Amino acid sequence: MKQPYNHGVLFYHEHSGLKDIHNGIGEVAKSLSSMCKHLSLQLSENKGDIIKYCKSIKNENYSSDVDVLFILGGDGTLNELVNGVMQYQLNLPIGVIPGGTFNDFTKTLQLHPNFKTASEQLLTSHAESYDVLKVNDLYVLNFVGLGLIVQNAENVQDGSKDIFGKFSYIGSTVKTLLNPVKFDFSLTVDGETKEGNTSMMLIANGPNIGGGQIPLTDLSPQDGRANTFVFNDQTLNILNDILKKRDSMNWNEITQGIDHISGKHITLSTNPSMKVDIDGEINLETPIEIQVLPKAIQLLTATEQNN
């Protein structure tokens, strides 16, 4: 088999979701070394290291022949690599290997949740271009959330058990918290403004959030648009609505309690100021401005999911 890439770099954290990271790296390297003439294993010891390595790759201080990047980790680790690639305009394909608490975007890439199987799938993968959300000065691949989403993310980051289960970020969050904290908001999408009061808001680029899939059949991270969902009340009807698949043309007609707005440019302010979760990382507070960057990043995508 001809190796399609010259030099690949595999980034990983010692504290990823894998029980034995060193054996895991060995298994992954078997597949990736078949794709690259030279494979470098790069440990990220501290948050921000991956972004620094991206700068070094851009300046060719790391090496002058790097032509593919790999990441072993969850959505937060992937988010760091996405920010490094976007900040330093690295026009390099990225292969994603699941290894964290949540691996939502690997589902979008049709990759298996098992790291070994996913790395084998990369052997027959192809690069596709995906949209990126620019949120203030940060970059986001999958979602932006506030309200109940942040509370759940903080529970996970604190190391406590995920009390909301697989569908944590959407369905069970609404069902479980009986007295959520509400906030006033002013949301402008492509020049149209909506104001109101809510306890949860989600802006999605990808269709998979918190282990579950948003039941919007035409939601795509390759269409140049972001999808905003505003949760208006906390009745159990919302949970039922969430589980019913529909397309964007009839969402607002048949869905009670969740408004859907699609667009390319979003501004959001709240009272009081709210923490913002971006791909599982709580790095911002409102107000925020979101711009969709169409097909801004290349990700290796499997031809079909290997179940």
Swiss-Prot record:
PANTHER family named in the record: LIPID KINASE YEGS, SPHINGOSINE KINASE
GO MF terms held by the record: ATP binding; ATP-dependent diacylglycerol kinase activity; metal ion binding
Cofactor note: Binds 1 Mg(2+) ion per subunit. This ion appears to have a structural role and is required for catalytic activity.
UniProt name for this protein: Putative lipid kinase SERP0390
GO biological process, one term: phospholipid biosynthetic process
Binding-site residues, Mg(2+): S220, D223, R225
GO cellular component: plasma membrane
PROSITE patterns referenced in this protein's UniProt entry, alphabetically: DAGK
